[in-house]
């Protein structure tokens, strides 16, 4: 069984993330969505909320693709998480050259730690290249319309959290 790991903070999950997840399901039999517990980032949504939103959105994808999608929180090194879930490949999304520079360094470090686990990059579709969770939160916080960047469920959660009812 081919197992892939798509890691991220997903605070919140965006249409860009969902697009990468959908496309990653074409490459593996089981896709683990690794939700990073990154206390330094000070997430808007706690871990349970992020996991719930991801599970809700991925349930639809599982039905459409037939690929098993599992959500797995982690706080350890990414390469250790990959080992823990039995992943042979780490999936990363790229939006721009700036993403590549960071990801290139990460691949080098991960390969030094375990060269049996590959990393593959999926380029964001053009319509999703500008989407970043940080920007979505800022737009929502300032009262802007984020419907082009997130699902209705996530838009509703953002409005609730930021008191925009």
Curated annotation (Swiss-Prot):
Pathway: Cofactor biosynthesis; coenzyme A biosynthesis; CoA from (R)-pantothenate: step 4/5. It catalyses: (R)-4'-phosphopantetheine + ATP + H(+) = 3'-dephospho-CoA + diphosphate. GO terms for molecular function: ATP binding; pantetheine-phosphate adenylyltransferase activity. ATP binds at residues 9-10, 17, 93-95, 103, 128-134. It is an enzyme of class 2 (transferase). It is found in: Cytoplasm. Its cofactor is Mg(2+). GO terms for biological process: coenzyme A biosynthetic process. Substrate binds at residues 9, 41, 78, 92. Its EC number is 2.7.7.3. Keywords: ATP-binding, Coenzyme A biosynthesis, Cytoplasm, Magnesium, Nucleotide-binding, Nucleotidyltransferase, Transferase. Its main location: cytoplasm. SUPFAM superfamilies: Nucleotidylyl transferase (SSF52374). Belongs to the bacterial CoaD family. Reversibly transfers an adenylyl group from ATP to 4'-phosphopantetheine, yielding dephospho-CoA (dPCoA) and pyrophosphate. PANTHER family: PHOSPHOPANTETHEINE ADENYLYLTRANSFERASE. This is Phosphopantetheine adenylyltransferase. It comes from Ruegeria sp. (strain TM1040) (Silicibacter sp.). The gene is coaD.
């Amino acid at each position: 069984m081919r197992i892939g790991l798509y890691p991220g903070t997903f605070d919140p999950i965006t249409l860009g993330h969902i697009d990468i997840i959908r496309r990653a399901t074409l490459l593996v039999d089981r896709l683990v969505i690794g939700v990073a517990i990154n206390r330094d980032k000070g997430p808007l949504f706690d871990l349970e909320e992020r996991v719930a939103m991801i599970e809700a959105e991925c349930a639809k994808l599982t039905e459409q693709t037939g690929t098993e999608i599992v959500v797995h929180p982690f706080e350890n090194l990414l390469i250790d998480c990959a080992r823990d879930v039995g992943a042979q490949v780490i999936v990363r999304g790229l939006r721009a050259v700036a993403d590549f520079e960071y990801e290139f360094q990460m691949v080098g470090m991960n390969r030094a730690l375990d060269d049996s686990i590959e990393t593959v990059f999926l380029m964001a579709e053009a319509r999703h290249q500008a989407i970043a969770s940080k920007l979505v939160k800022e737009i929502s916080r300032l009262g802007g319309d984020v419907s082009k960047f997130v699902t209705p469920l996530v838009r509703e959660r953002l409005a609730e959290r930021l008191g925009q009812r």
